[in-house]
Amino acid sequence: RRSSSAASDVYKRQEYNLPVTIGKICSDNNVQNFTYISSLGASSKKTNLYLKNKGMAEEELRKLNFKKFIVIRPSFLIGKRIEERLGEKIGIFAMKCISPILVGDLKKYKSINAEIVAKSMINISNSEIQSGVFEPPQLLQIGRE
């Protein structure tokens, strides 16, 4: 139990406290635009700790009333990494295996390249869009423009 509680504290600090604190600092210093990288499926109502913390952070950041507030919700990120982790290697392999069957409504769960996500963030930031939540289908389209 202790390790589970410690893990949930770490998750909350990383996925909720840190972005909300940064958001408040930005808001207090009159930063007009804020882009938050969340996760596909994020919701404060989820039981999954990662998705719940991401969803709670989205809600708190939204309350800060930035002129332009963008939420980026990528699926499983792939691409170059400084450090390789076994769990991520397994995830990448698994996504490659199941990707061909992710069609229709499931298509948004396909892995997405981090470079595409970065390009879409830049394109959205430079656009007239004032706010919105962007998931993989939109990110793929905007990131290739």
Label each residue range with its predicted role.
Residues 29-33, 65-67:
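A short helix->loop->beta-strand "cap" motif at the edges of active sites that frequently abuts
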Residues 26:
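Hydrophobic pocket-lining residues that define ligand/cofactor binding sites across diverse proteins
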Residues 44-132, 137-143:
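Oxidoreductase cofactor-interface core, primarily capturing Rossmann-like NAD(P)-dependent enzymes
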Residues 1-7, 11:
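Single conserved hydrophobic/aromatic residue that forms the stacking wall/gate
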Residues 19:
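Aromatic/hydrophobic pocket-lining residues that form the small-molecule binding cavity
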Residues 34-40, 72-74:
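SDR active-site strand-loop-helix element
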